[in-house]
Amino acid sequence: MSMMFLALHISAFSQILVRGKVLDSVGAPLPFAQVQLYAHEGTTPLAATQSNPNGLFTLEVADTGIYRLEVHSLGYAEYLQEVVVGDAGELQLPTIQLSPSYEEIGSVQVEGERPVVRKGDSVVYQVGAFAKGNERSIGEVMNRMPGLYVSSDGSVSYQGWSVSKMMVGGTDLFGQGYGVLTNNLNPSAVKEVQVLENFEESRLLKRVRRKSERVAINLEMKDGAGQVVGSLEGSYGYRLMHRANVSLVGVWQGLQWSLLANSNTVGETPAHSWADPQGLNNIGSGEELSLPIPKPGSIEAVTSTQGSSAPLSASRRRRNLSHMVGFSTVLSPNRRFQLKANVVGQKEDDQYASGYRSKVKIGNLSFNRDEQSQKEVGSYTAVGRVTLDWEAYDQADLRYEGGYSFRQNQSNGWNEGQQNRLSEMGFSRWQRMDHTLLYTQSFDSAGLIRGGFEWQSQWLAADYSAAISGTVPRGLVGKQGLTASYPQALHTGKTLWLYLAPIAKGFTGDARLGGLYFQQSLLTRGNHNRSVAATLQQSDLFAGGAVNYTVGPVLVKAGLLAHTVRQDLEATLPSELPGKRLYLAEPSLAIVASTERHYGLLKYSRNSTTSTLLDVLPEPLVKSYRSTQQGSTEFRLHHGNTYQIYYSYANVLSRNSLQTQLYYNHNSHPIDTHDVIAASHTTSYIISGRRSSTLYASLNTDYYLGILNTTFRAAASAQRSYYTQNVNEWEIPLVDDYLTAEVSLRTHFHSIFDISVGADWRTNRLQSDGPVQLRHSTSAYADLQFTFGPVLWTTTIERLEPGVQKGNPNAAYFLDSEVQWTVLPQKLTLYISGNNLLNSNTYIYYSVDNLEAAYLRYDIAPIRVMAGGRWQL
């Protein structure tokens, strides 16, 4: 390791730093301005970067002399300046203030802007070119932009890369939990979606890493500094249904805030989840360097999973009442200090109803299920975070991040079987407190050190009970009922220190050193097993590094990370359980080739995890009234070898893109499971299994046909997994195939019509020693929109055929329609909407898993007819 440090340090060469700050026309810091440095008469930039959220930038040049500095930013006039670089090692430029770009054209009106443009490392999408006018969130519009894909939880990917941050006006308001912004910010106030490639928020990290593997998004609002923008929306309708939404963003010099609120009974979950804190993960300019912190386990009532996991959108299946409020603020009193604070609270009540009918035959085991279930669940979520960034001095930064997270769930359900009625109650309360201190020290030409300390504490109260009517047992539930409780506490400490070497003759690299310690306390209680108190301690020490070599557009990366892991378990058992130490190494090799339009990746990595000594406890843990889990029989290592090929193409100006991937994972030491299934009151069996390998391939493409103003989007994926399933004395090899295909087409003529059609197909094929089980799911939709002056009419027709067998059709039809009337342009819009207008009360879904094929009947959300209005500030 010391030789690696020495080699990286000796190969460094001296650089001259050119620093500056960019302001907008009112004197506020201007983020993401493109800054380029040319030779005095040159045409190719010698150095380029973009200003950070505080307007600051740093460029590096190798020689003294006279240069030309150019600064560009959308909406501002080009800035040119002659720069004389001496041999002082560093040059501080005067503050640069840009002027707005206006063009006097008399009475001539310029219609529209280019929908997509590239500015250096930024790709800018005009929201108006992709919005239809009836979207409820900016995420709906972004999902139509070429290269962008938005998940249901609000997370975004660009050209296959996960977006790490989403900012508003250059300010990061919600951190990694930006999904609440994607799903709740009204698009009517957003002018541009700016995708920032090679994004790096650390000003010091930019000095040693000119390129980053991170991607971020900035939402540029329609109004400038000193304004409050956003919208207020409300609707009310049939069966007392309602939807209300507040979406506000305020910007002043040195202060920015956002207020998001939502209350609805139309199936929306405003905050799907809250991302884990970044902590010390991925602090090295995009290199994958993550040590996941374990989470405590919980118990899930069976009636709580049926219905909530139905393969249908939430607005189609949920009977809900949801309330959410989120507030975030960023305060920058001076250029060296920034405070970010945000809080999100949510309350949800849900109702689901479903039926379950199946037949299982394994060897000489055979049993049937015929059950009807209903459940109610209530949940509370609260999250608060604070981040402090301090530029201690020119070559050092300090960051503190801390937060508190809370989630409570309570469910009540009943299950009507052939023998009797089963009642279930589940309760869980999870809390987490976390603190991270991150220090960054730059040594200019000698590289950079970055690292710190992280601490997390988690607490979980998990209780479960089940009872039957009568005396005939249901699974594990007898006449005495079933109770289980697993209170847990988990405390984790982590430290990581990273050295990043500067670039020298195409070579660079890093070295890393750190450790992780956690302690988990578990108390098992209930009438199915005796009480056991256990405390598990684990330490993980690791060291390693990576070397990168760049030649032209090709980058070769080789890395190695070595671990030593030890676990010790103390439990209230007659015999003492010894501790154990394991050693493991994780090599990786990647070859990357990239240009402005093309990106290719070949990668190999070895990933290792360990089981937990808690699994060797002789008392099994209750999972539900149907089963218990005993886990692995020993503390051991699990290996996985991953091979990946990835290619993407993006022609932003023509709005065409393509991403394709081939992924193979082979587990030489796969994970074991060990469950005891109480299938019925007369039948039980022991099941254990392991996954040995998975092959996955995918293709996504966007194609724009300009002559017809039509966008074509297609996606396909295929996955094959190999398993070995052991049921009592039988060993069953399984092959699981999963195929998907999606296609959509959108054509529109501005201000007259907008038509979208699409379809998708999914199939699951499961093959074992017995018969092949096969199911299909298909859907198709047509989305029609027409404009008649101030009136906008939208109608969506959808056909779903979920989980069907050949020759057994099972279609459900849905009709949604909305009429909008713009009373005051850019201000007031009134609308009447109807959802689920053609649906029946239930639909049937055919499901297959490793051993069981089942027919599930789900209730569908009722018809919704509502009237409302939206006021834009």
Question: Where are these predicted regions, by residue range?
Answer:
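Face-selective signature of the C-terminal outer-membrane beta-barrel domain
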Residues: 330-348, 377-413, 422-571, 594, ...
